[in-house]
Design a protein with these regions (language model features):
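Outer-membrane beta-barrel proteins
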Residues: 2-361
Length: 361
């Protein structure tokens, strides 16, 4: 028993001597710093492990044929996109960031910072990914591109019958579902611009809008999808002094699927606030058919009536046919679009044919 006590005392003496040697010249403040540094490193490692990042992308090769005066050179083109998504948990909420980059990283094409608050919904700041009323600007079914895609002064500019008062850039976005109905609202202050950090945009009207979407389960109709939305661009303010009142955007759609066939119909109105502004009324329909799990075809028509306040109204009439074949990550798609009285110009016609091969990864 006494022999074991001697061994224990000897070990304590050796450990005490080693600690004195190691800590010689180090005060308690230094020891605290070492401890805090180690703790901070542990916390950083923990946060990094809690985050997830994914990368996706696509490459698109196209052949485009338009009017003889529009395509006079090489009709082939290519586009590549990369999208980065990062997400992690902060105080019980999921914070995620999305950014898509243009060809050769020439710049940011869209970005989105969002906070998923569970039952309280999702709050986001959007720089081009899609929010509010713009998410249902054209819901008619198609196998490839929309009826207006690729035509002169097409709806991608935000005019020509496509609703979306707040737009997609520089907007705050809130999404939540109540009783089977999804609310998607957007609001911006001033012009809708993709500002970088520390920057501000030029003058422009503030705007807000929302979209409501649901399915047919509330009505006992499987295969039915419904939606409607409304928005205003506020004019006559310091930011936008255009006289005549606010711009109003509204739309409603219904799509019904039965087996391999989907039919959709949509109406929209854009009432301009300016005294001499041109209002727009839109009606469109589309029919899509899935031949099998790989092949689909579609056809649709779209009319836009331009209500000219001091001239005869002009009705733009467009139609388009599309086909798409998917095999794994590869997709081959083609569409042919035509329009008469294009963009409120009587007698002006346009046409576009495109064949595209894309690879997703």
């Amino acid at each position: 028993m006494l022999k074991n006590s001697k061994y224990i005392n000897l070990r304590i003496f050796i450990m005490h001597s080693l600690m004195k040697t190691i800590t010689k010249g180090i005060n308690m403040n230094d020891m605290k710093k070492i401890g805090l540094t180690a703790l901070a490193g542990s916390l950083v490692a923990f946060s990094a492990n809690a985050a997830e990042m994914t990368v996706s992308g696509a490459t698109l090769l196209t052949y485009t044929s338009e009017d003889t005066t529009e395509v006079t050179g090489n009709p082939f083109g290519m586009k590549t996109n990369l999208a980065f998504t990062a997400s992690g948990e902060v105080n019980g909420m999921t914070v995620s960031y999305y950014q898509a980059s243009k060809d050769q990283f020439a710049g940011m094409s869209s970005a989105r910072l969002s906070i998923d608050m569970g039952d309280m919904g999702t709050l986001a700041f959007d720089q081009g990914s899609g929010s509010g009323l713009a998410t249902i600007d054209d819901k008619t079914p198609t196998a490839a591109e929309e009826i207006w895609d690729g035509l002169d002064t097409d709806g991608s500019s935000g005019a020509n019958g496509l609703v979306g008062a707040a737009g997609n850039s520089g907007v705050f976005n809130y999404i939540n579902t109540f009783g089977g109905v999804t609310f998607n609202g957007a609001a911006r202050r001033g012009s809708g611009t993709k500002n970088s950090d520390g920057a501000s945009s030029a003058a422009g009207g503030s705007a807000w809008d929302f979209a409501l979407t649901t399915d047919g389960s509330m009505l006992g109709l499987d295969g039915l999808a419904l939606g409607a939305g409304y928005g205003e661009k506020i004019v006559g303010t310091q930011a936008d002094s255009t006289p005549g009142g606010d711009d109003e955007h509204m739309t409603a759609f219904a799509n019904y699927s039965m087996g391999p066939v989907t039919f959709g119909y949509q109406v929209s109105n854009i009432d301009k606030g300016g005294a001499a502004a041109v209002d727009q009324e839109v009606s469109a329909w589309g029919l899509a058919f899935n031949v099998n799990e790989n092949l689909s075809v579609s056809y649709g028509e779209r009319d836009v009536t331009f209500k000219n306040p001091s001239a005869t109204d002009v009705e733009e009439s467009g139609e388009g046919i599309a086909i798409a074949y998917t095999m794994g990550s590869m997709k081959i798609a083609g569409n042919r679009n035509e329009v008469s009285n294009n963009d409120n110009s009587a007698g002006t016609n346009d046409e576009m044919t495109e064949i595209a091969v894309s690879f997703a990864f």
